[in-house]
Amino acid sequence: AEIFYAESLEKLIPNMQDAKPTIMTAVPRFYQNLFTKINMNLKKQTGFKKKLINQTLILGKKMLKKSNLNFNEKIINFLCQNLVRKKIKKQFGGNLQAFISGGGALEQNIGEFLNSIGLPTLQGYGLTEASPVVSCNLPDLVKVDTVGPAFRTNKIKIAEDGEILVKGENVMLGYWGQKEETDKVIKDGWLYTGDIGEIDLNGYLKITDRKKDISVNLGGDNISPSKIENILCLNEYIKQAFVYGDKKNYLVAILVTEKVENESKIKIVLENINKNLNLIERIKKIIVVDEEFTIDNRMLTPTLKLKRKEIIKNYKHRLDKLY
């Protein structure tokens, strides 16, 4: 095997065309951007092309759910495979067998879209203390709202409070020279991951949140900021989102947006998103900022996750004004 590293995000597609990878790993934000760009391009199509793309998505989702295609659907899907999926796959080198997503939650409709359009996308889960992979979806049975079944070398169980526990030969012996810290996360051979999740009837693991990231509002309700942030970022006008509201009576958000003529456009977008959220999850007020969250300004981790404490520290004064 050979390993290739992309020169930059901007040069990723040309790099993939040169390298012709069979497997590629990336964090969810990459797939989120990819979803937005492909979607915007597909929306420009008209006539027969538009109908064919719509059928590609409809039939792709049907196959993803292991539903049988009738005779007519099989013929249409044959056309979709050769006229749509193969062409899209060729843009990524032509040999791609799977995208692997890890390092955070991949939104379900992004996973469905990419798999349906001809880009097999498998979501997995792991952490450094588990060397680092715990589970991953299987190519022949993809459940996009999960991170797949545990590897054969692993065992997974869910603690009473919902925390995911992992045991196996890949789990670390401990933190070097830090017995006290080790004892906090390894008990009776089980690694306490700090993630909250559940296991379905097929043994597929579903991550619901990071234990330390769950917010509790003034009413005592548990709220997942990352879930709401992912939903916000599905909109083509919202590039990044940070949701805030721990120990508050409503939620607010900091949004990094695409350039729009006026802020009222973003407010209309937010109103539409709020309609599909539970009452306690709705965003009441927003701050629109120009500066993106990046690794360089210390708002993102190296795996492109939000550094919540750093963002709160930088915007505390403006956040407080929203309450």
Region annotations inferred by a language model:
Residues S8-L12, A105-L106, T128-A130, D221:
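Short acidic loop-to-helix transition motifs that present clustered carboxylates
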Residues N15, K37-I38, Q178, L218, ...:
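Residue-level signal for well-ordered alpha-helical positions
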Residues M24, L64, C80-L205, K211-I214, ...:
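Conserved AMP-binding/adenylate-forming
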Residues I158, G168, L173-G174, I196-N297:
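AMP-binding/adenylate-forming catalytic core of the ANL superfamily
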